[in-house]
């Protein structure tokens, strides 16, 4: 139960998830599935059917109930890939985020290798096109340390794309891409996801989104994320209960983050862009040697002022 609403199954395409508070309730639902499969001559694949036992934090499990589907035994797992996201019995996002980070690094290397001869601006566009999906990230705990490791890998990729020093200031790295820093982007996606749930045509999803805004629901992972975003970025928590506030909240968030991002000398940043274009061969400047260009780039990227 979530509040007073019982949610016992979810479905996406041919993927079905059953949720039950007791073993007996699970057996009842599995029987319904088996009877349906028999009636309509379909089969559930036992090799792709797994069981996960979620327990109260810190409490050991003494007994694992036995379940069957279509006469086949269902195995237990501690984690499982579901629609591209790893679900863990400990209700932790760590494995999912680390897995996404590892996949991201592989994608980045492929893009930078395949498009190595293109200029930095074009490679940045391709990097976002091929590597920035982050499907399922709206469900992550935004306070997990592993997210910072993911963001660090993304900043490293941008530094490689623009061929700037490894200690280039983070705000300059983000400004070069003319996008929000990755962490801010993940927060922005969570905001849009929340309002998307509020206006969903599915009444279950709408009810869940509204429940997250009450005191009890705010202790859930998504509720904690919304409270964290409000605290971190000075947003009104009550605004997340009103669908009419969507544009206002996202506009304020993005404007606030861009103002913080460009808190450096923009004239020096424009010089940096020109030097990087010269380095890429897009611009030509006869009176500066390659060493001069590198020196200017290094000075602007790492200057403390």
Predicted regions and their residues:
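Short, conserved micro-motifs composed of acidic
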Residues: 43-78
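Short, flexible turn/loop "capping" segments at secondary-structure junctions
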Residues: 8-11, 75-79
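Non-catalytic, peripheral interaction segments enriched in hydrophobic/basic residues
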Residues: 13-14, 45-50, 54-57, 81-208
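Short helix/loop segment immediately N-terminal to the Walker
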Residues: 1-6, 119
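Structural motif
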Residues: 2-4, 69, 82
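Secondary-structure transition/capping motifs at alpha-helix termini
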Residues: 36-43, 164
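Charged boundary/loop elements
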Residues: 47, 137, 141-142, 196-305
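Catalytic palm subdomain of template-directed nucleic-acid polymerases
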Residues: 7-39, 56-58, 88-93
């Amino acid at each position: 139960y979530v509040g007073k609403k019982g949610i016992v199954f979810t479905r996406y395409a041919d993927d079905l998830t059953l949720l039950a508070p007791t073993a007996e309730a699970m057996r009842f639902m599995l029987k319904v599935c088996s009877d349906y499969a028999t009636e309509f001559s379909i089969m559930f694949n036992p090799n792709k059917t797994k069981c996960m036992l979620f327990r109260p934090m810190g409490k050991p499990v003494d007994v694992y109930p036995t379940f069957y589907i279509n006469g086949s035994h269902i195995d237990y797992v501690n984690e499982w890939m579901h629609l591209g996201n790893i679900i863990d019995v400990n209700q932790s996002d760590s494995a999912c985020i680390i897995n996404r980070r590892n996949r991201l690094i592989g994608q980045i290397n492929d893009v930078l290798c395949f498009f190595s001869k293109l200029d930095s601006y074009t490679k940045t566009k391709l990097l976002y096109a091929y590597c920035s999906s982050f499907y399922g990230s709206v469900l992550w705990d935004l306070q997990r340390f592993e997210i910072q490791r993911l963001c660090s890998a993304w900043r490293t990729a941008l530094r490689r794309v623009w061929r700037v020093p490894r200690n280039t200031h983070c705000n300059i790295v983000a400004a070069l891409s003319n996008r929000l820093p990755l962490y801010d982007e993940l927060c922005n996606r969570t905001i849009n996801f929340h309002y998307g749930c509020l206006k969903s045509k599915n009444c279950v999803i709408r009810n869940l989104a509204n429940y997250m805004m009450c005191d009890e629901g705010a202790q859930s992972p998504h509720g904690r994320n919304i409270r964290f975003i409000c605290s971190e970025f000075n947003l009104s928590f009550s605004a997340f209960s009103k669908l009419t506030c969507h544009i206002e909240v996202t506009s304020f968030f993005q404007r606030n983050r861009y103002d913080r991002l460009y808190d450096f000398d923009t004239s020096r940043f424009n010089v940096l862009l020109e030097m990087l274009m010269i380095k890429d061969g897009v611009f030509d400047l006869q009176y500066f040697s390659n060493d001069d260009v590198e020196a200017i780039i290094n000075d602007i990227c790492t200057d403390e002022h």
